[in-house]
Amino acid sequence: MASSVSTVCLWVLLIWYSYITSCDSSSTPRAVTHPVLNATSNFNPTAGFYSFSCNADTYLLRLNSFSSIWALMNVFVVLVSTVVFMTYLCFTKFVHTLIYQQK
């Protein structure tokens, strides 16, 4: 089981790496069109995340930064540990019910 999980993780990392390397990370900033206001503004990728000009329409999420990789790994670890814990919990309750609740 452990080897199959490690194989799946290796394939996921390989696919993710090929996706990141195929993305054009050296692209120039483009004008962003707001559909409601129909206004354009120049997107500055170095603008601060906490500035007032940064909102959901102008902030570009990048999956090739260290913090995004770390966050995705944390989400994966939490999901796997939750599944393992819930499987253990449900299995022990099922066995406990079978053994001690027979009447």
From Swiss-Prot:
GO terms for cellular component: host cell Golgi apparatus; host cell membrane; membrane; viral envelope; virion membrane. Residues 26-68 are virion surface. It comes from the Viruses. Pfam families: Herpes_UL73. Residues 90-103 are intravirion. Belongs to the herpesviridae glycoprotein N family. Interacts (via N-terminus) with gM (via N-terminus). The gM-gN heterodimer forms the gCII complex. Envelope glycoprotein necessary for proper maturation of gM and modulation of its membrane fusion activity. Also plays a critical role in virion morphogenesis. This is Envelope glycoprotein N. It comes from Alcelaphine herpesvirus 1 (strain C500).
